[in-house]
Amino acid sequence: MADKKGSTGEKLLYCSFCGKSQHEVKKLIAGPSVFICDECIDLCNEIIRDEAAISEKEGGLAVKSDLPTPHEIRQSLDQYVIGQEQAKKILAVAVYNHYKRLKHLGKKDDVELSKSNILLIGPTGSGKTLLAQTLARLLNVPFVIADATTLTEAGYVGEDVENIIQKLLQNCNYEVDKAQRGIVYIDEIDKISRKSDNPSITRDVSGEGVQQALLKLIEGTMASVPPQGGRKHPNQDFLQVDTTNILFICGGAFDGLEKIITQRSDKSGIGFGAEVKSKEERDVNEVLPQVEPEDLIKFGLIPELIGRLPVVATLAKLDEAALMEILVEPKNAIVKQYQKLLAMEGVELEIRPSALTAIARKAIKRKTGARGLRSIVEHALMDVMYDLPNHKGVQKVVIDESTIAGDGKPLLMYEEQPKVAGSN
């Protein structure tokens, strides 16, 4: 009954759903011959929210509705990563298609879209890890970096491959739904290659065995992870994480792969019309983009793993010009970072072009790529950063070629006259 007569004869209105009178609730809203109170409306809203969350889990993972286009992804990568244009294009398309696929999940269709995991091949310090980190930050998804060299088969001393998923969960406060649409970057994947391209008769717990374990994770499995970082034991309840929709990016330097590619291309280039090139002429940057699955198998990756990494992007070895650009151009450029640090002391930092050239050449000589740039700049500025808080009146610090070479010290510019760091 929506209305009754009270003891005083007044007509009382009641909620048609919970039966409470108009005096027991804050608001009673009338419809055609029915009434609903504010408490029932709140309850209905809560039920709708819960059901929407359940259908989102079953029908498809929550993915950013404003997914950036490949061009927008590429532009964002350009702000942090210098060069590697082809690799950025390949990554932008692969990541866009992956998250577009997640939006498509749960829709009834004849076509099932497969996941496109990525393999990055390039020298140390060429930007493999930075590309993966930048992508995860752009898409605002959980991200974890795993080192393949620390992994072993289950049951052996070392990290289990499922520890990767545990770290991913930690990075998103153990929200399983978020982790299931995250990005995993596995570094040093080339270091777990089997020792020869023939299957081994002995146990290879940190090579082929790890590849087999990673294979299950990458292609999609239910990983059992102990809650809140606990250790595994038999009577424990595990969190179940489906890795089917996690994007895996594997990276490695693959030292020596260019020789395998060259040998293959030399065999196919025999005859009168073959172009003869000396080995010295064959630049790594020219050879690596010609990589084929058979080359990776010969290097020591198992065919099944290569099949699960269909998108292959090669990164070029960075030259002097690229390294100089990396020092000053990106949003998080090393020179900008040190200028900011010194600006906090009220001091301007100037690194002259000759010094930038010297830094780039030193990194090339060390064969550390962009990764080695920071340590060179840090070493050059160490004494200045140590002494600066105690020096009053310093306006500017100048770094030139001699500072990088170790022949001279940074120049401290005072209001009155220049003074060399460390001099009396």
From Swiss-Prot:
Pfam families: AAA_2, ClpB_D2-small, zf-C4_ClpX. One of its GO terms (cellular component) is HslUV protease complex. GO terms for biological process: cell division; proteolysis involved in protein catabolic process. SUPFAM superfamilies: Glucocorticoid receptor-like (DNA-binding domain), P-loop containing nucleoside triphosphate hydrolases. ATP-dependent specificity component of the Clp protease. It directs the protease to specific substrates. Can perform chaperone functions in the absence of ClpP. It comes from Ralstonia nicotianae (strain ATCC BAA-1114 / GMI1000). Zn(2+) binds at residues 15, 18, 37, 40. GO terms for molecular function: ATP binding; ATP hydrolysis activity; ATP-dependent protein folding chaperone; protein dimerization activity; unfolded protein binding; zinc ion binding. PANTHER family: ATP-DEPENDENT CLP PROTEASE ATP-BINDING SUBUNIT CLPX-LIKE, MITOCHONDRIAL, ATP-DEPENDENT CLP PROTEASE ATP-BINDING SUBUNIT CLPX-LIKE, MITOCHONDRIAL-RELATED. NCBIfam families: clpX (TIGR00382), PRK05342.1 (NF003745). InterPro entries: AAA+_ATPase, ATP-dep_Clp_protease_ClpX, ATPase_AAA_core, Clp_ATPase_C, Clp_protease_ATP-bd_su_ClpX, ClpX_bact, P-loop_NTPase, Znf_CppX_C4. Component of the ClpX-ClpP complex. Forms a hexameric ring that, in the presence of ATP, binds to fourteen ClpP subunits assembled into a disk-like structure with a central cavity, resembling the structure of eukaryotic proteasomes. ATP binds at residues 123-130. This is ATP-dependent Clp protease ATP-binding subunit ClpX.
